Amino acid sequence: MDILRLIAVAVLGMALGTSCGLNFIHYMHMFQLNSYHADEQFKWIGKNIKDVIMRHVFTIGAILTFIICGETNASTCFIAAAFLFLGIVFSAPKKAKKKLVFTPRVMRMTVTSVILYVLLILLVFLTLGMGYASLAITMCVQILTLVMAMIANLINKPIELMINRHYINDAKRIINGLPDLTVVGLTGSYGKTSTKFYLEKLLGAKYNVLMTPESYNTTMGVVKVVRGQLNATHEIFLCEMGAKNVGEIKEICDIVKPKHGIITSIGPQHLETFKSIDNIIKTKFELADSLPDKDGIIFLNYDNEYIAKHECNKNKVTYSLGGGTDYYADNISVSENGTQFTVHNGNEEKQFTTKLIGSHNVQNIVGAIAVANTLGVPFADLVMPVKRLECVPHRLQIIKGTNKTIIDDAFNSNPTGAKAALDTLAVFDGFKILVSPGMVELGEKEYELNKRFGEQAAEICDFVIAVGERQAVPIVDGLKAKGYPEEKTYVAKNLNEALAKVENIKTGGEKKIVLLENDLPDNY
């Protein structure tokens, strides 16, 4: 092999390796965001087929170069490498909202994938020799990056199950070794994370409390917290429980053994994976089913019709806004500086003040008050903790500036929460701007509910920026249905473009009040 051809082959190999690496990392990132579920990954591929094709079209050009030329001289290798380098430019990593986390599981899948790549390439060259056909077939490994993470995950599945089982058993051992610990489970289609944060502050007036951080609510996320943070000094463990499929709440309950639980809401969130609202109801009430019959208590938000109508034979404490439940709030007064309300329980009542804005927040606070009071914290001792409650980041978080106020509700939007966010926006005086890509994972109702969101926005907003050309369609249709002026509507390709548009909107001297409703992760 002459020197020039050797250099050309080396350049080709470098280009192929770089292209494979960039695309493998990209697809692994999406696989992680899709919870390592192959069916979710294939749905993502279908929704983003144009981007997927563009990531591999230059590789097809490299393959055709060898097929058409029928030889492996230096010029052919350089041309093929040029195609691959063009693909590398297109596949260059973009700034991610949530970066790929190189967990031990990801590293194991990566090692398995590398071994598979090496074996495939060796098999090709040992079978066909160093000809143009071998190089053309070798180029196909770049296209294989599309499914390689899923293949590696399938191969590693027995190992992953064994590792997970070890961690789960260890978490069970820790829980069983803390007989005086009270575990409170929290679940709901929405509101569970905010309620958890509020409850941690309210119970902290009397107890040493540990809660699962941020949105740690999967089985292995909970296991990680139990193994890494829970100890004998903790008196109460607040365990958030999330699910996308039937049985996932029960799986967490079997590990942490909750004594009490709270179901904050039931709605069409994750309807795409649950398939039906009945499956969502069944899954959320797996928490109630797991509680001890004798002294376990399930706290239920009776403002939610699905919860109120569901028959539950456990000891229950109900809460709501308005009345007719064990705990309820009324006399709710909302301003842009906060909210005042009165909470009742039997003959006892107490007025509370919070910096948080809107009845949506009051509902979650009342749920937290119901749990804390039932667990022995008097109303009088809850007044100051409620007053000191801070907004949970990205959940109706108010960020005030000189010329504009941001209402950051960017985390996991849902139909009820989105309406509550618009109601919060309506409280403020100023030029009201909505920035939103709409809501996802709502199954067959996704278009209908996003269109309704657009209709609701038309009643409140002075300007609407819909983010994402595909996601914007139902929102814009909802605005049009209400006769919303077209000149007050803008469709942005991404959040950065939307925020740039916010800066350029003329308000006639009014202060800008900007609602950021939902911020879809990178896999949408």
Which residues make up each language-model segment?
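Switch II (G3) loop of P-loop NTPases
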Residues: 234-249, 406-412
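Proline-aspartate-enriched helix->loop->beta-strand connector
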Residues: 257-259
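Acidic, Mg2+-coordinating active-site environments of NTP-dependent enzymes
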Residues: 263-405, 430, 451, 455-463, ...
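Membrane-embedded segments
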Residues: 218-219, 223, 245-251
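Walker A (P-loop) phosphate-binding motif
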Residues: 171-217, 520
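Membrane-proximal helical linkers
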Residues: 155-178, 195, 222
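Short beta-strand segments
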Residues: 185-187, 240, 301, 435-437, ...
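ATP-dependent carboxylate-amine ligase
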Residues: 1-160, 370-380, 384-524
